[in-house]
């Protein structure tokens, strides 16, 4: 009688092994899904960062085309580096009520974002004068940015081509 009461209180070794096997199989099935979710999140962050920097470059170019500030003609109106987009420029704004031209510092980005694929702040840069397929930056200006990651996205495209 005492022996049967002890058996009912605990698990047998077989029950523990079966439970451990089932949990292991479930964990192995979920692992690829978790890796895909992490990769997808990094891709979303990369797209967001690229879009933010490209919009900042476009805003800088628009002000240059409007002659709102002085720039070196060799740059074609594009920023000379990413730091310029963070530090900002002194732009001439519309006249105030005294018909005086007002100068204002305009910043295009708060900071240079981190590349989620390379985990660094080092981005691939392309100038207006560079070949569109070139990975080498001429240094004249910044026309476009891209990641330096050689990886392939979930949709099969190369990250460098984004």
Regions found by a protein language model. Name each.
Residues 1-9:
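N-terminal leader/signal peptides at the extreme start of proteins
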Residues 29-41:
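Transmembrane signal-anchor/signal-peptide helices with a preference for the extracytoplasmic
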Residues 38-65, 77:
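Membrane-proximal N-terminal amphipathic helix
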Residues 58-162:
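Low-complexity, acidic interaction segments enriched in glycine
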Residues 17-32:
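Alpha-helical hydrophobic helix detector
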Residues 9, 15-18:
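Internal alpha-helical transmembrane segments of multi-pass membrane proteins, especially GPCRs
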């Amino acid at each position: 009688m005492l022996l049967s009461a002890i058996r009912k209180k605990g698990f047998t070794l077989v029950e523990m092994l079966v439970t451990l096997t089932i949990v292991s199989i479930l964990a192995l099935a979920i692992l690829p899904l978790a890796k895909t979710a992490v990769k997808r999140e990094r891709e979303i962050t990369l797209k967001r960062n690229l879009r933010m920097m490209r919009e900042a470059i476009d805003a800088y170019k628009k002000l240059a085309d409007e002659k709102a500030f002085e720039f070196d003609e060799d740059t074609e109106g594009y920023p000379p580096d990413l730091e310029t987009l963070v530090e900002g420029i002194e732009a001439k704004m519309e006249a105030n009520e005294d018909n005086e031209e007002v100068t204002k510092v305009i910043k295009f980005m708060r900071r240079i974002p981190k590349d989620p694929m390379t985990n660094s702040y080092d981005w691939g840069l392309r100038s207006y004068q560079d070949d569109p397929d070139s990975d080498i930056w001429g240094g004249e200006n910044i026309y476009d940015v891209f990641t330096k990651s050689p990886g392939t996205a979930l949709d099969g495209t190369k990250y460098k081509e984004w």
